[in-house]
């Protein structure tokens, strides 16, 4: 990931950026995130959802803290320096995590591998397709919210809105993680996905009202945080913690597909029909992802 960020700082064309950031940083994130989440999930049993919520709260904290900082760095020193700063911060934090990590007291891989763990399990594919829809919905805000604020002439900071998404996602990760054990992990996960889709209706209503956009960012962030915190716990509940990293790795490719398909689709709709049609499409994507989860049932393997 550090190498990808440093190389991105040196690109001279957008195509090079696709390679260095999309492939380099993308592979780095995948190699870091999945093992970290799987390790935390394997270490804890009784308070797994809370532990996972705490672990992934760092993503929201990073969004909250670094977005305004990087925006300022770009304005004063340029985007190349911003990527270099990201590389340094990432390298230091990853080194600390690598030194402090310990193997969990359970086998790291299932005896038969991922294929045997998810083979013949329709619930995995329900989760997979749901994640494609949900990710496509989520990335609409991350990719197009700043452009929307600029295009519509809305009076307010787009960076602040993205920061609020990160801040409220921390509350979602911690809050949903804490209460999931009491109300049911899968049920709470369903409603997180449904809430994500429904939040885009607030964006439709907002038009150029910045205060309503703030409400949208906060609700979206809470729902997003719940999804991030609960998805590994759902995997642990359905498939167990043995080989959890492999199952999560397979499942998270759905997020990549959603992120790959969603923004171009939404961008095409914006160009053809405007933002309202794109926002409503995001509503449908989020609702589709949430509704599919009603086909899941809790079945923790022994």
Give residue spans per PLM region.
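Interfacial helix-cap and linker-helix signal at transmembrane-aqueous boundaries
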Residues: 65-77, 149-150, 179-180, 265-274
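A membrane-interface helix-boundary motif in multi-pass transporters
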Residues: 72-88, 268-285
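C-terminal transmembrane helical hairpin of 12-TM major facilitator-type secondary transporters
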Residues: 157, 165-169, 175, 183-234
């Amino acid at each position: 990931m550090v190498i990808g960020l440093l190389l991105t700082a040196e690109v001279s064309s957008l195509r090079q950026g696709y390679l260095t950031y999309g492939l380099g940083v993308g592979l780095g994130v995948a190699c870091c995130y999945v093992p970290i989440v799987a390790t935390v999930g394997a270490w804890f049993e009784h308070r797994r959802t809370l532990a996972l919520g705490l672990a992934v709260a760092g993503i929201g904290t990073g969004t909250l803290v670094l977005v305004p900082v990087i925006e300022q760095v770009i304005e004063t020193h340029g985007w190349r320096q911003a990527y270099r700063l990201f590389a340094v911060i990432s390298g230091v934090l990853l080194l600390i995590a690598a030194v402090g990590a310990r193997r969990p007291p359970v086998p790291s891989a299932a005896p038969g591998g991922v294929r045997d763990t998810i083979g013949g399990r329709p619930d995995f594919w329900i989760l997979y397709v749901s994640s494609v829809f949900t990710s496509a919905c989520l990335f609409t805000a991350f990719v197009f919210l700043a452009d929307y604020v600029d295009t519509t002439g809305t009076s307010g900071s787009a960076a602040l809105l993205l920061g609020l998404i990160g801040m409220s996602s921390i509350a979602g990760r911690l809050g949903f993680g804490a209460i999931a054990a009491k109300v049911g992990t899968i049920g709470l996960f369903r409603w997180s996905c449904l809430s994500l889709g429904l939040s885009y209706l607030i964006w439709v209503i907002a038009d150029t009202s910045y205060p309503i956009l703030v409400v949208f960012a906060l609700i979206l962030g809470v729902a997003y945080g719940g999804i991030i915190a609960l998805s590994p716990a759902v995997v642990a509940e359905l498939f167990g913690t043995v080989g959890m990293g492999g199952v999560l790795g397979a499942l998270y490719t759905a997020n990549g597909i959603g992120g790959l398909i969603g923004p171009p689709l939404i961008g095409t709709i914006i160009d053809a029909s405007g933002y309202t049609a794109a926002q409503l499409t995001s509503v449908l994507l989020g609702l589709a992802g949430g509704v599919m989860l009603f086909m899941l049932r809790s079945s923790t393997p022994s």
